[in-house]
A protein has these predicted regions:
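Mg2+-dependent prenyl diphosphate-binding active-site environment of isoprenoid biosynthetic enzymes
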Residues: 22, 26-152
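N-terminal amphipathic/basic leader segments beginning at the initiator methionine
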Residues: 1-22
Length: 152
């Protein structure tokens, strides 16, 4: 398979997984709408694709790595939502579309970003079961460091 084909296939895996992540979890539809608005807004998906390709290069199963790769994308999206807020960069557009806080309001945007950060760890805990508990915990700790004050 050529690299471009592999990249497209990985992106399709990520898109499909992200779209299915929050199905049936809609006690607050407005919050989930805001989360999905930014999560599915497009982009190159370079972070999850790099995670999947690293897994593949090390001889791992890409389907096992998919929840972890998508968790990384959730963290990235949360950071973009928060970065666009009026108290930060106050951006009106992201990828040619109105930013989350322009569509859903500042309070909902903050909650959507927070919820995506939390959802990243929930995704690892619920769907990362193909790994041993020890390895999933190590991956969670690594993501926590990268997403926290010692990382981003």
């Amino acid at each position: 398979m050529m690299y471009d084909d592999m990249l497209r296939a990985d992106c399709a895996l990520v898109e499909d997984y992200l779209q299915r992540c929050f199905v049936g979890r809609e006690p607050r539809a407005d919050l989930y709408d805001a989360m999905m608005y930014s999560l599915l807004a497009g982009g190159k998906r370079i972070r999850p694709v790099l995670a999947l390709e690293t897994c593949r290069m090390c001889g791992g199963d890409v389907t096992t790595a998919l929840p972890f790769a998508c968790a990384v994308e959730m963290v990235h999206t949360y950071s973009l939502i928060h970065d666009d807020l009026p108290c930060m960069d106050d951006d009106d557009l992201r990828r040619g579309q109105p930013t989350n806080h322009k569509v859903y309001g500042e309070a909902t945007a903050v909650l959507a970003g927070d919820a995506l950060l939390t959802a990243a760890f929930e995704t690892i805990a619920e769907h990362g079961t193909a790994l041993s508990a020890e390895r999933a915990l190590a991956a969670s700790a690594c993501l926590g460091r990268a997403a926290g004050a010692r990382g981003m």
